[in-house]
UniProtKB/Swiss-Prot annotation:
A cellular-component GO term for this protein: membrane
The protein's name in its UniProt record: Fimbrial protein EcpC
Keywords attached to this entry: Disulfide bond, Fimbrium, Membrane, Methylation, Transmembrane, Transmembrane helix
Domain of life: Bacteria
Protein's cellular compartments: Fimbrium; Membrane
Disulfide bonds, paired cysteine numbers: C130-C143
Removed propeptide positions: 1-8
Residues in the signal sequence: none
Topology class, membrane: Single-pass membrane protein
Chain segments annotated as transmembrane: 9-29
Residues with the N-methylphenylalanine modification: F9
Family assignment from sequence similarity: Belongs to the N-Me-Phe pilin family.
Length: 153
């Protein structure tokens, strides 16, 4: 009589594979969630950054920072898929562009958070300092630096 050869995986082999997949998922899921939050926060940085030219130009022409979006010559409502609003304001000797994230439909770590670009005039050029109440790991790398110079438009 010939013995039958068993084919396939044993139960212990399948359990080991499932355990390995679980460990990999436990590592990958938080990293993916952080990636999603960073990509959503970059929309706020890009929308706010897109207003720097208009705000700088207003200051160059008038010698004061614009009080609101209308004064800066930008749309009253600036928003995006993840950004609720982008608002221009004057704060003392600085111009401020503030982007506020939506409260729903965005990653939990950035819900309702704000990102502000504070402009300072420096003898014909401007520097922009980025600040946010969101965790630094969600901010674009260029926003983690103290100030980035912007030439006069």
């Amino acid at each position: 009589m010939l013995k039958q050869v068993q084919k396939g995986f044993t139960l212990i082999e399948l359990m080991i594979v499932i355990a390995i997949i679980g460990i990999l998922a436990a590592i990958a899921l938080p990293a993916y969630q952080d990636y999603v939050a960073r990509s959503q926060m970059s929309e706020a940085f890009n929308l706010a950054g897109g207003q720097k030219g208009a705000v700088s130009e207003y200051y160059s022409d008038k010698g004061v920072w614009p009080a609101d979006n209308a004064a800066a010559g930008i749309a009253a409502t600036v928003n995006g898929k993840y950004v609720n609003s982008v608002v221009v304001s004057a704060a003392g000797t600085n111009g401020v562009i503030t982007a506020t994230m939506k409260s729903t439909g965005v990653a939990k770590g950035v819900q309702g958070k704000t990102l502000a670009l504070k402009g300072t005039a420096n003898d014909g050029s401007f520097s922009w300092e980025c600040s946010s109440n969101a965790d630094a790991k969600y901010l674009p790398s260029s926003c983690r630096n103290a100030a980035t110079p912007t030439p006069t438009p």
